[in-house]
Amino acid sequence: MDTMQAKSTLPSKLVWSLVAIIGAISFGMLALSRGEHVNAVWLVLAAACVYSIAYRFYSLFIATKVFELNPRRLTPAHRLADGLDYVPTNKYVLFGHHFAAIAGAGPLVGPILAAQMGFLPGTIWLLVGVVLAGAVQDFLVLFISTRRDGRSLGEMAKQELGPFAGIVVMLGALGVMIIILAVLALVVVKALAHSPWGVFSIAATIPIALFMGVYMRFIRPGRIAEVSIIGFVLMMLAIVYGGHVAADPYWGEFFTLTGTQLTWCLIIYGFIASVLPVWLLLAPRDYLSTFLKIGVILGLAVGIVIALPDLKMPAVTHFIDGTGPVFSGSLFPFLFITIACGAISGFHALVSSGTTPKLVDNEVNIRMIGYGGMLMESFVGIMAMICATVLDPGVYFAINAPAAVLGTTVESAAEAVRNLGFVVTPEMLTVLAQEVGESSILSRTGGAPTFAIGMAHIISEIFNSRAMMAFWYHFAILFEALFILTAVDAGTRACRFMVQDMVGIVIPAVKSSGSFFGNLLGTAVAVGGWGFFVYQGVIDPLGGVNSLWPLFGVGNQMLASMALILGTVILFKMKKEKYV
């Protein structure tokens, strides 16, 4: 615990005072603009200052005063080490694995959809929500699960709240988890369908991760930096070579898969990944994916500082009354339901009580992994908000409004957008579609295309050329697919643990991580559940993302409330009620 205590010197006080002043100025620029375009760099600075202050002071207070983290306390990864699920893991590798697991579709898609209300409401919730709720929940659940041998959320609820409450939480969490995984997987399917470049590059990360797992465990143990460089280089080569694969007549057709084919591939992959030892595929693949995730997000932030794009969307639009075309619902509660993971997410509680606590090497690492990981995800949400709001509002609504509102031609879409109170011309929509290499950008709902176009727009402004718009657009689509797929990996494994815990009430032997039958049963229920919903969404587009996303948002927040209730009860039992 002493290692976390930071000395407050005069230079340190001056630095943090400067950070606070910069943050205050940035918020002032965002909040006090009078109908003028605000530069996106103020949003980046405001977020960076909030995250820095929250991590330096608030998370340290929680770690030392509330949780009293002890570096000398043996973690379950050491006491129960089995080489399968309980494996002491380097804190940077585990941070990568945990971040990759929690950062799915939510922080990318949610803020983009919420941008129809303006950039300010969503930004405030992304920052305030994560500091006071989301990061605290992740930190809390990871802490209490690590102190309880890595038990799942449902099992801890049964232990702390009683058998009936525990079973209710287990069943509710399992149902919500299946819906969440279905939404995540469906977004991946929509992004990769008929995209040989994306399919090849995503598929290539599997053998690369297997190689990294074997390399770190048997060939060069402990050489984290070395294997990281190798894995990153191989992944970049896979992405670059994917363009050549897509252009090849034979291999391009081979890797061109329909939505149904991709669904079955994901089901098979999810089953295999969940039963393999965590060190072999899951941890190295998530760690590998994190390089791309964090690298792209930080690179995008630097790009915003260089390009200095303006936020074209108003701070607040008239759609806060619930009449918006992107999603129906007023500011409260639909803004919070829609943004979901970027501020607080119940899904994180399942990951923080599923795979991650079984891998913690030292208890003091929980602060960086739990609180820090969630701050990083919120920053992803901020980047998504910027990508949506740097676009002309007319273009934003042309991409995100459904076909029932826009029609099927650029002329009808331009007229529909004008009726919404914004201006866009058919020529603008046609030229933009050509620049990103698509036949049309109309009604490309789901958030992913908007993020990709916004990212391509920002990068093009850096180089003052739109010649590479198509490349950056498809790179961003690939990035989003990889971003989301890693959450499906870890979520399926966490779902397996939940099934084993429930069946273990009747058959105790099934609960053991060494039970091969329990592993197969839990995995089959997990992938069968979310696979069914994904398949239905693929064959019936009306029952896809548009229907599942509201269920995802509501269920996600409900699960977060369960986790916070459980955490509150445990803090009371620890005699920490004065901090609640």
Across the structure, where does each feature detected by a protein language model lie?
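Flexible loop linkers connecting adjacent transmembrane helices
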Residues: 2, 60-87, 113, 127, ...
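Membrane-interface "cap" regions at the ends of multi-pass membrane proteins
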Residues: 2-22, 53-108, 290, 330, ...
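Transmembrane helix-loop junctions in multi-pass membrane proteins
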Residues: 25-37, 108, 120, 178-194, ...
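Membrane-interface helix-loop-helix modules in multi-pass membrane proteins
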Residues: 28-34, 85-148, 159-163, 179-194, ...
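Extracellular loop-to-transmembrane helix junctions
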Residues: 37-56, 60, 114-144, 154, ...
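Selective recognition of specific alpha-helical transmembrane segments in multi-pass small-molecule
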Residues: 49-59, 173, 178-180, 234-238, ...
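Loop-to-transmembrane helix boundary motifs in multi-pass membrane proteins
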Residues: 160-178, 370-379, 445-447, 465-476, ...
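Extracellular/periplasmic helix-exit of transmembrane alpha-helices
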Residues: 304-320, 375-454, 490, 535-543
